[in-house]
Amino acid sequence: MFWFIVILRYNKNSSRKTKIVIYSGEMNMDKDPFKEYLRESEPNKATKGYVWSTAVGLQAVDGLKPSQYLIDTAIQNIEGKITLKEAQSLIESYYNERPVRVSDNERTEEADKVSSRIAELLSETAFSFSPNEYIAIHRKLFRGIYKHAGKIRDYNITKKEWVLDGATVVYGSASELRATLEYDFSQEKDFSYKGLSIEESIHHLALF
């Protein structure tokens, strides 16, 4: 099944919605370890199930697969046996104590740590739609994993994307990234979603 994840903040005092993140990819829902919790009648469990399912799904977009330890720890959190902070602490300790690291190709440690951090971000209510928040989210997700976490690149890049059948994407000039971010965010803040269908909203977000 091909899926989009669109997470929006709604401003109760206006018709605007503020985008946090949009991703697309493929996921076999029959293999989703949190599937049973998505049907839970208990709101808290259902919400946690969606949070963890989304976090793991976003890793799958980059071809990353979390460990069974992460899945088991997440389920403990969903069932209320441990808090999210305790779940994160267990994940951090798990890798601090491991004598053998997985290969770079598997990148399981990255998948586990980033999944738990995404789950935390999706559970928070505080949010500011700004370039600084955008950069802060990157820092929070990838701290200790990548040296450039939370930093705007200072060099130009190109990248082949599997979602585009290997086509090469040329990214914006490094010298203009900050100005480009400021402009794009200001344009989005002024955009009104009033009267748009879900499909039209997703189309606009994808272009943004």
PLM-predicted stretches and their roles:
Residues 2-208:
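FIC/Doc superfamily catalytic core
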